[in-house]
Amino acid sequence: MTEQKKKVKACKDTDYLFISAYLRAKEPQLLTEEKAVRMLSSSVQEAARTLEGCGYADVPTIGLDKALNDRRAAVFSEIEALAPKDGVVALFRMRYDYHNAKTIVKAEAIGTDPTPLLSGAGRSEAQALKTAYETGEAGSVPQAVLTAMQTARDALSRSADPQLADLILDRAYFAEYHETATQVGSAFLMGYAQLQADSANLRAAVRARRMHKDAAFLKSVLVPGGSIPAEEICQSLAQDEPFAPLFANTALFAAAQAGDESQTGSLTTFERLCDNTLTAYFAKAKSVVFGEQVVIAYLCALENEISAARMIVNGLQAGLPADTIRARLRDLYQ
């Protein structure tokens, strides 16, 4: 059975009056920089209590991963029930479909059970995705995901290279993400999708140069949907020219400059600038009173919060100095 694409219904900004007001009222509960700093200077138990104040379950009792995953699942479901337009939350769920796809394909190749590593945050139930992959029948699973999994499996069986399978699924993810964002019809969301693709391609270009890869390799890993043509990025690599001029008219210019300067050593600053550029984009929704931008920004803030919470608590449990953890943190939605 093939997947039928749903036409996303059109909505006016005023359709978002209720959910915008609701999410604005919940924003103070989000993890802020002030709360994160307090967690860094506290014990693991005290940090867990701070997370409870942000709406998370009891971390010491159920474990960090379950607490974070349960929080994401609850917020996704709540916003899906309240949002007037289909597609917005689905875009945020999509990354977990492809995470599960990578896990299932690679687990099959090495003969292990993928279940413990599967996420429940995707559009499709993880078990349904696994069944579709095993039977070749999409059922309720998006056909684009199943097709990409089959392509990745074929490539993996020929090459025995897990990275190649990941690259195929990454490209499929960005292609479907761009298509779905276009269907939703939100200029704000399409801008975010384009910025994500540009960020992914800049990271790929910087890493390719550090690894002394050629333009053919880089072309194979660049994803669709960005504003910078793949040919221009590959040409800069081939001619050993800096990438920053290509990104001069984008929000990623500072990150690109940092990438050009990071031929050796740590990429921490470069990676943080890339992520912070994405945070700065959705933070623009702060000036919007109501509309789908408010929903999109809240979901982005949630994902950032979960990443920060995981980084802080894991760092504290590992006994890392606060400054070391802080250097890895990204900007939070303020």
Where are the regions a protein language model picked out?
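N-terminal domain-start signal
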Residues: 1-334
